[in-house]
Amino acid sequence: MSDNVPTIAAVATAPGRGGVGVIRISGKNLLPMAEALCGKTPKPRVATYADFTDADGQAIDSGLLLFFAAPASFTGEDVIELQGHGGPVVMDMLLNRCLELGARLAEPGEFTKRAFLNDKLDLAQAEGVADLIDASSRSAARLALRSLKGDFSRRIHGLVEDLITLRMLVEATLDFPEEDIDFLEAADARGKLDGLRRAVDDVLANAQQGAILREGLNVVLVGAPNVGKSSLLNALAGDEVAIVTDIAGTTRDAVRERILIDGVPVHIVDTAGLRETDDVVERIGIERSRKAVSEADVALVLVDPREGVNDKTRAILDALPPELKRIEIHSKSDLHAHAAGGFGTGAETVIALSAKTGDGLDALKRTLLREAGWQGEGEGLFLARTRHVNALKAAQEELSLAALCGNHQIELFAEHLRLAQVACGEITGEFTADDLLGVIFSRFCIGK
């Protein structure tokens, strides 16, 4: 990083009241600031108890000051942490004192961004910080910690090292074109490429599982009015999150709920009827429902077996994207017998279900996990993001193209290897555009 980097400060603990509140400061040569804050010269990595004072020497609070000298800190710069009482007024006064002493307010994720830019973390590890904070289940937290501790990064670095080794082998032959084929055959370049492809496939499979655990499955409930969509949402959520009445059209807006199935987040939207209406409020809800449908991975199509697919249901089905996966739900199975087979909704799976008794809910949950592609938490998994999966798919594609190169296409072979390396490097931040970094770190919380 440049030497002209400003000192930054932020509250590092959650907003609101608490037993302890933490102010984090990062920059260069922070000892004078530490002395101004507490009237003492702190020793690195030693907790110093002191009064934190304002510009007039009046105590704002008392607590612990921790000083971490560069480069042995989270950000790689000098870092100060003030641990005081966790009231919002006290935290605000302490933060303002830091700003008076020359710091500026940190942007979201700026501490972690500095850690990345100072080579304390790679990009996958930095994302692991945010994913650990945002984890929605114990499984997600465990896998995010693995990413933060470098499990994912080590797999990627191993791929990159093997790619570099193979590239050096292939590119060296370009200087001796008359011997290239024999040289590559003797070095088993094709065998090494096959091994690389298998390794990428393995990391990709793990990354896809990690992405499922982080990002989950988007599900929409669709069907004719009063067919039981809201009742099913309540049954899945285990709570009254949607109003249930016998009046058709009760749901005038999309109702959203997140549930966990074996640690996998499932984002469910109970759609307002996908129909035309003159009601302004209902029309807004229908537009939101259409947006939810466009973003969905799976549609649960609710059908009353006594009526089958009526005109209203058919109109809803026609409004669904043809490629959207569908599960046909025969609702209210406690009131009538389950109809054999489906009703031509385009679904491969049909489940009879009663939201009232719970019959069929477990079968539906298992089906949703299968649709998500979740295979269960196993050894070697780590939390991953869609961008990681896409980068690994790009590397996989480049290696497949390299495998198609003939014996006299050495330059093309080498280029595909280079592009595969670039794709892998995007995961750890070795090859990453500044605008992508801005997007990634802007989604962190302030103070991290």
Curated annotation (Swiss-Prot):
GO annotations of cellular component type: cytosol
Residues annotated as binding GTP: 226-231, 245-251, 270-273
Gene Ontology biological process terms in this record: tRNA methylation; tRNA wobble uridine modification
Key words, A-Z: Cytoplasm, GTP-binding, Hydrolase, Magnesium, Metal-binding, Nucleotide-binding, Potassium, tRNA processing
Annotated K(+) binding sites: N226, T245, I247, T250
Binding site for (6S)-5-formyl-5,6,7,8-tetrahydrofolate: R24, E81, K120, K448
This enzyme's EC code(s): 3.6.-.-
Cofactor note: Binds 1 potassium ion per subunit.
Subcellular location: Cytoplasm
Keyword NADP belongs to the record: no
Lineage top rank: taxon: Bacteria
PROSITE patterns named among the record's database cross-references: G_TRME
Cofactor: K(+)
Binding, Mg(2+): S230, T251
GO molecular function terms listed in the Swiss-Prot or TrEMBL record: GTP binding; GTPase activity; metal ion binding
The UniProt record lists the keyword Nucleotide-binding: yes
Residue ranges constituting the TrmE-type G domain according to the UniProt record: 216-373
Function in brief: Exhibits a very high intrinsic GTPase hydrolysis rate. Involved in the addition of a carboxymethylaminomethyl (cmnm) group at the wobble position (U34) of certain tRNAs, forming tRNA-cmnm(5)s(2)U34.
The family this protein is said to belong to: Belongs to the TRAFAC class TrmE-Era-EngA-EngB-Septin-like GTPase superfamily. TrmE GTPase family.
Assembly and interaction partners: Homodimer. Heterotetramer of two MnmE and two MnmG subunits.
Protein name: tRNA modification GTPase MnmE
Organism: Neisseria meningitidis serogroup C / serotype 2a (strain ATCC 700532 / DSM 15464 / FAM18)
